[in-house]
Amino acid sequence: MSVKDLYHNKWARMTFWSVLYLLWVIWLGNYWWLFGLLVIFDHHITRKVKWLFWKKDYKEGEKRNALLDWLDAIIFAVVFVTFINIFFFQAFKIPSSSMESSLLTGDHLFVSKLTLGPRIPATPLTIPFTHNVIFGKESYSTLIQNEYRRLKGFRNVERGDYVVFGFPDGDTVLTKAPADDYYTVCRFYGKDYAVKSYGPVIVRPSDKKDHYVKRCVAIHGDTLSVVNGQVYINSAAQEVWPGVQSTYTVVTDGSRINLKTLEKLGLNISELMYDDALPGYPQMPLTAAMLKEVKGCANVVSVEEQVDVYPPDYPDSYLMLFPYKESFRWTRDNYGPIWIPEAGATVKLNMENLPLYERIIRVYEKNQLDVTPEGSIIINGNVTDEYTFKQDYYFMMGDNRHNS
């Protein structure tokens, strides 16, 4: 039997689609969907119900209805692309410069959902081909909300992976300043001012947070530290990936570096400022390879990496650095150590380390957490000095380390 004969054989078509559908149901793990096999059987064999009710069956020689044909094509495209986006791969746009020079602002990525396993939509009532906004309004309804669930993928997140994820603080958004972190604005100016000036406030489901793209530098169970800009994982210096860049002060002999040289290095000329008083460039973002090229320029006198030490140049900079407490005395270049929680692991809690895990316990793992005036920690009504985590966590950094 030829392929053409198989295509026109209704039993062969029914068997083919039934096998594919059955494999999908097994992967999905929701066996109520097995009733869909009855739909496939009826559509191909018994034809008791016209499942594609919008699609007209034409008699031989009958003129086709262009409107119905377009409707059929649109419905097919919406269903097919939505299915592909949920379970297989999806296009994303780089929203910021935090990954330069590895990934540039405005770059489009096709991200595989199969690698880590696709996440089942928690908010299924969404306008197709939108994420969270359309025409300045939210593009979804929260009438139906599902629990977080991810299907099995080929592997887990590994150190060094580029990862697209929902911005952790993106559950709350100021409508007049959606690109600004609500919690950071509140820390700087107070909640009342933030809401009055930039509100109203929108609360978004977990799968409708804005997408961010970063590199995973630490996985669950790791202890992360940054010492003078060098990342350490479990006390071992981490590999510096080719795209990672820091900010340097470049002093010249009074002349500017050739523009063609700067463009060849991939630097954004419009963002580089030359200071005649230095003389040179007060801030120049460079990777290791770019640093070598700049040092080789004949008119460059010195190149010095900018390393934030404590106390920082800006006294309130801790308000932008997790865990947002001045008592930690951390900076972006001298940070930690911080232990990354993993499922099943228990951590001892006290008032000193509680800020590191408070949001995880309260928001991500949905517990009631309170602290008494005397400093006692109460979780779900019980006084405790420890907590066992339910999920694995990861630590992300942008490759553009001083602008991320």
Please describe what each predicted stretch is.
Residues 1-404:
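Extended hydrophobic leader/signal-anchor segments used for secretion and membrane insertion
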